Amino acid sequence: MKFAVSVFFTLLLCGAALSQTPRIVTAPQANGTYGYRQSEIKILALGHNKLRIQMDLIFAYKSPVGPTANTGEASGEATIENDTAIFYPTDNHSCKITIKFLAGNKIKVTEEDTINCGFGMNVTSAGTYTKIKAGKPKFDEDR
């Protein structure tokens, strides 16, 4: 009985250790355009743990004169380790954005302090985005 209990706990601990093994994100998994509501994030793996990021963010709402929107943008390079990238936009180093790559072609984006990102009233990058186009995205600077 002691042996069976010992084996059970050993297997339980090994299983817990395996489930905590960090997931490495490959370039094909990362590359693409991700969408959430009307917002888009473009990601390109550059190698050496770097990602090129472009965010086109939209907060749509209805006003007395009809539909309108506030917008925000951010671009630059992020550093990725395992399945999590940290992004400070080129023009705003006080805005820390975390991008976590999830299973099912999704990313979860969080902002450390939304007000410091200065995207515009009610505009945020936060949310769970789904990959809407795989492969190398076209960035605004490339056009």
What are these regions (language model features)?
Residues 17-19:
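Boundary at the C-terminal end of the N-terminal hydrophobic targeting segment
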Residues 89-105:
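Acidic, glycine-rich flexible loop segments
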Residues 1-7:
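Positively charged n-region of N-terminal signal peptides that target proteins for export
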Residues 23-35, 49-52, 79-88, 108:
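Short, hydrophobic/aromatic-rich segments at coil-to-beta transitions
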Residues 21-42, 125-143:
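Tryptophan-anchored aromatic micro-motifs
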Residues 39-80, 108-113:
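N-terminal glycine/threonine-rich, aromatic-flanked beta-hairpin/loop signature
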Residues 115-122:
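Short, exposed beta-strand-loop hairpins at the edges of beta-sheets
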